[in-house]
Amino acid sequence: MKSAKKLLSVLCLGIFILTFTACDMVEKTPEAKAKSTIAKVNGEKIQRKDLDESPSMQQVLSQIKTQYGEEFEKTEQGKEVIKEQKKQILENLITEKVLLQKGKELKVIPKDEELNKEADKKVNEIKAVYNNDEKKFEETLKSTGFTKETLKEYLKDQIVIEKVINEVTKDVKVEDKDAQKYYNENQSMFTEKPNTMNVSHILVKTEDEAKKVKKRLDAKEDFAKVAKEVSQDTGSKDKGGLLGDISYSDSNFDPTFMKAAIALKSGAISNPVHTQFGYHIIKINSKKEYPVKKFDSVKEDIKKQLKQEKQQEAYTKKIEEWKKASKIKTYEKNLL
């Protein structure tokens, strides 16, 4: 099972025929189901087997069996869960189909000899994950529904998709001034050590409640005492609102909350801060702040990060444009 998951994880790094029956009431054979059309993209069909045999679907089924048992997918609840997962994976297959079509249009598909060579290289990289143990590699292929041939075809598609993405994003550039601007606006991200703050808060539902709390605190009432009385954060209420040490870059907290907390000086108490959870009164018990690294020492890392973000933005915009211009039809009834 671990070997299968390992292969699926590698394969899932990628971007991720028509059947005739006299009547819908007639039960299709497994072969007919596999060949049934689940989508058409500019006239090209995506068959159910393309979805069922995909690494993403194999990974989903493996996870479902591990968590819920072998029989879960046969239940009504299981079928509904699997159908929803299939709909999401189908959307990815449609995106891949559009990209493969654009590969032909943009003339970025390598010649067969070169494409085979690149695919073989990727196969060898996957084998290296298994320490080049051919038997273990073949056993894992079998358990994930692949043969050597179908794996290679899958990888060839991923190579083409990668080349299309590279073509779309090749002109993306980031100037030094862009990096400098980002550095100036986010200096707390570039300290010698991560800046941290010890934080307490009081959470209430309404702004009026928050103003009343702030008034009590301005009158020098004890923060922890007030938190225990009125805070609606069950995780910190009994600790006097204490959240503990938080890194400035911690993404587990609401961005608005973090921005307000970082702006406060040590010992300060905020005005009401509104987030998706309600209204907070934030207290900074202490801070540990470190010197900021010089711009030149982090410039290239910033440019690399900004370039990746711009490339992702350019790719997302282009694929949405291509899909909107494509003729796409789905057949959800054939998913199960």
UniProtKB/Swiss-Prot annotation:
Record's catalysed reaction(s): [protein]-peptidylproline (omega=180) = [protein]-peptidylproline (omega=0)
PpiC domain: residues covered: 194-286
Bilayer topology: Lipid-anchor
Lipidated sites in chain (S-diacylglycerol cysteine): 23
One CC-aspect GO term: plasma membrane
SUPFAM superfamilies: FKBP-like, Triger factor/SurA peptide-binding domain-like
Signal sequence segment: 1-22
EC number: 5.2.1.8
Compartments reported by the entry: Cell membrane
Family, as annotated: Belongs to the PrsA family.
Annotated function: Plays a major role in protein secretion by helping the post-translocational extracellular folding of several secreted proteins.
Name of the molecule in the record: Foldase protein PrsA
Gene this chain is encoded by: prsA
